[in-house]
Amino acid sequence: MPSLSKEAALVHDALVARGLETPLRPPMDELDNETRKSLIAGHMTEIMQLLNLDLSDDSLMETPHRIAKMYVDEIFAGLDYANFPKITLIENKMKVDEMVTVRDITLTSTCEHHFVTIDGKATVAYIPKDYVIGLSKINRIVQFFAQRPQVQERLTQQILTALQTLLGTNNVAVSIDAVHYCVKARGIRDATSATTTTSLGGLFKSSQNTRQEFLRAVRHHP
């Protein structure tokens, strides 16, 4: 994978090794983003015409291009590891060995089954070993993996694996609570249910006390 940061390549390889990478076909050719957007816009034009929408209307005529730009540059930008966030690791000179938790990380993703919104929040915790990570980088890693067609279970495990790989420790935990619009806006149309997924590693899995400390943080209990 050319032109990737060392961190992005390490994370990608770890996900592939664990069978957690997003399903991607081998690229038939290397398309630049502008070509990709142009092709997507053409296909979206055909879809809208099949829905009998009038693309000569000034409200609709730019919609195929808007959708193409949104897909490539925004909501599916996490499919391209060139967009993996720049990671700042700091040597753990303070010998921090207690849980570090970031709560209420806002995430918006897209259900890969129906291409509609997943809207939720993540809580991420880790116990430092040799390094600590800049706190905003945790948010950015969550957002990177959310910017893909996803299932929530895989998203949770991808975030866990990425942080374990970067931090050099298994002691990482991730919990996501989200509303799926494929449930809320179609099908059963259940507007009140939410889905919670949790992925635990190291002490968060093996130690009941550590696991309970994390779960209390997820629930905002003191």
From Swiss-Prot:
EC class (word): hydrolase
A GO-annotated cellular component: cytoplasm
Molecular function per GO: GTP binding; GTP cyclohydrolase I activity; zinc ion binding
PROSITE patterns, per database record: GTP_CYCLOHYDROL_1_1, GTP_CYCLOHYDROL_1_2
Pathways involved: Cofactor biosynthesis; 7,8-dihydroneopterin triphosphate biosynthesis; 7,8-dihydroneopterin triphosphate from GTP: step 1/1
Keyword NAD among record annotations: no
EC number: 3.5.4.16
GO BP annotation list: one-carbon metabolic process; tetrahydrobiopterin biosynthetic process; tetrahydrofolate biosynthetic process
Reactions performed catalytically: GTP + H2O = 7,8-dihydroneopterin 3'-triphosphate + formate + H(+)
Gene3D superfamilies assigned to the protein according to its UniProt record, in alphabetical order: 1.10.286.10, 3.30.1130.10
Keywords on record: GTP-binding, Hydrolase, Metal-binding, Nucleotide-binding, One-carbon metabolism, Zinc
Residues engaged in binding Zn(2+): 111, 114, 182
The keyword Metal-binding appears for this protein: yes
Any Pfam family matching the protein: GTP_cyclohydroI
InterPro entries: GTP-CH-I_C/QueF (IPR043133), GTP-CH-I_N (IPR043134), GTP_CycHdrlase_I (IPR001474), GTP_CycHdrlase_I_CS (IPR018234), GTP_CycHdrlase_I_dom (IPR020602)
PANTHER family: GTP CYCLOHYDROLASE 1, GTP CYCLOHYDROLASE I
UniProt family annotation: Belongs to the GTP cyclohydrolase I family.
UniProt xrefs under HAMAP family: FolE
Subunit and partners: Homomer.
Protein name, UniProt field: GTP cyclohydrolase 1
Gene designation per UniProt: folE
